[in-house]
C-alpha cells in the first residue's frame, strides 16, 4: 500500500517565526507522511526543532568545488534532508534546466542516499494542443533510461498552467495523467511502478484536496502557497486520512 505524502514546498518564502509556528503545531499523522521542502537557510533550525521530514528545494549537479551559491547533496544530507525536489517547473523555466542536468543532480542525490522528488508537467501550450503525454515522456524517458529509478523514487506531476494560478486540474484529468505516468514508468520498471508514489502539485487547497486524493493513482500532494499557512496545510492533511 502506498502511504500518502503531503509535501510542503515553501519556495523562497518563510522565516524563523513561521517555522516555529509549524513546529508548535506538531503536524503529524499516522495516515500520511509530511515533508517540508524549505529554503536552505531554514533547514538547520527545522532540524533542531524536530520538523520532519525535510527536503531540499534543489541540489547542485556537482559534488563540491568553486560553484558559488550552489548547495551539494552532502550538505543537504548534513542538514537532515531525506528528500530533495529536482526539475521543478520554476527551475526549468527560470534556470533553463534540462534532463541532462537533472540526471546529474539525480546521481548526486542517489550518492548521498537522498530520495528525489522529480517534477514533471506540461506547459499551457502543450495542454491546449493535447500534447500532455508527449511532454511527460520527454521529461521521463531520459531518467528512466539511466537506471536511476528505485522503489523510493517520488514523481510529482505539476501542470504548469495550474501553478500559482488558482486553476487546479480536475480530479478526473489529474487521475488520467497520473495513470499515464505510472504506465510510462512501468514500461521500464514494471515491478516498481505499482508501488511508486505519485504526487499532484498545482493549486492544491483544502476544498479540492479531498476529491484529488480519492483518485486511484494520486498518492499525495506537492503543495505551494497553502503550505505557508498552518491552518490550510493541516486541513489538507486531514483530507488524506
From Swiss-Prot:
Pathway: Carbohydrate biosynthesis; gluconeogenesis; Carbohydrate degradation; glycolysis; D-glyceraldehyde 3-phosphate from glycerone phosphate: step 1/1. Substrate binds at residues 9-11, 164, 203, 224-225. Keywords: Cytoplasm, Gluconeogenesis, Glycolysis, Isomerase. One of its GO terms (biological process) is glyceraldehyde-3-phosphate biosynthetic process. GO terms for cellular component: cytosol. The active site is at residues 88, 158. Coiled coil: none annotated. It catalyses: D-glyceraldehyde 3-phosphate = dihydroxyacetone phosphate. CDD domains: TIM. It is found in: Cytoplasm. GO terms for molecular function: triose-phosphate isomerase activity. Its EC number is 5.3.1.1. It holds the Pfam family TIM. PROSITE patterns: TIM_1 (PS00171), TIM_2 (PS51440). Involved in the gluconeogenesis. Catalyzes stereospecifically the conversion of dihydroxyacetone phosphate (DHAP) to D-glyceraldehyde-3-phosphate (G3P). Belongs to the triosephosphate isomerase family. PANTHER family: TRIOSEPHOSPHATE ISOMERASE. Homodimer. This is Triosephosphate isomerase. The lineage of its organism: Bacteria, Pseudomonadati, Pseudomonadota, Gammaproteobacteria, Cardiobacteriales.
Amino acid at each position: 500500500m502506498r502511504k500518502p505524502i503531503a509535501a510542503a514546498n515553501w519556495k523562497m518564502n518563510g522565516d524563523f517565526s513561521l517555522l516555529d509556528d509549524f513546529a508548535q503545531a506538531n503536524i503529524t499523522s499516522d495516515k500520511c507522511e509530511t515533508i517540508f521542502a524549505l529554503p536552505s537557510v531554514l533547514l538547520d533550525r527545522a532540524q533542531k526543532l524536530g520538523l520532519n521530514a525535510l527536503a531540499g528545494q534543489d541540489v547542485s549537479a556537482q559534488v563540491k568545488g568553486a560553484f558559488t551559491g550552489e548547495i551539494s547533496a552532502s550538505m543537504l544530507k548534513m542538514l537532515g534532508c531525506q528528500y530533495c525536489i529536482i526539475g521543478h517547473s520554476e527551475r526549468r523555466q527560470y534556470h533553463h534546466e534540462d534532463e541532462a542536468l537533472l540526471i546529474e543532480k539525480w546521481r548526486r542525490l542517489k550518492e548521498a542516499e537522498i530520495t528525489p522528488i522529480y517534477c514533471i508537467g506540461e506547459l499551457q501550450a502543450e495542454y491546449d494542443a493535447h500534447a500532455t503525454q508527449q511532454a511527460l515522456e520527454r521529461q521521463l524517458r531520459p531518467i528512466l533510461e539511466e537506471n536511476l529509478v528505485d522503489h523510493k523514487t517520488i514523481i510529482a506531476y505539476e501542470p504548469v498552467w495550474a501553478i500559482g494560478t488558482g486553476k487546479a486540474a480536475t480530479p478526473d484529468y489529474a487521475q488520467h495523467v497520473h495513470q499515464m505516468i505510472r504506465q510510462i514508468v512501468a514500461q521500464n520498471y514494471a515491478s516498481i511502478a505499482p508501488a511508486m508514489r505519485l504526487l499532484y502539485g498545482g493549486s492544491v487547497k483544502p476544498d479540492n484536496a479531498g476529491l484529488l486524493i480519492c483518485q486511484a493513482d494520486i498518492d499525495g500532494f506537492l503543495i505551494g502557497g497553502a503550505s505557508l499557512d498552518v491552518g490550510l496545510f493541516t486541513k489538507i492533511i486531514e483530507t488524506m486520512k
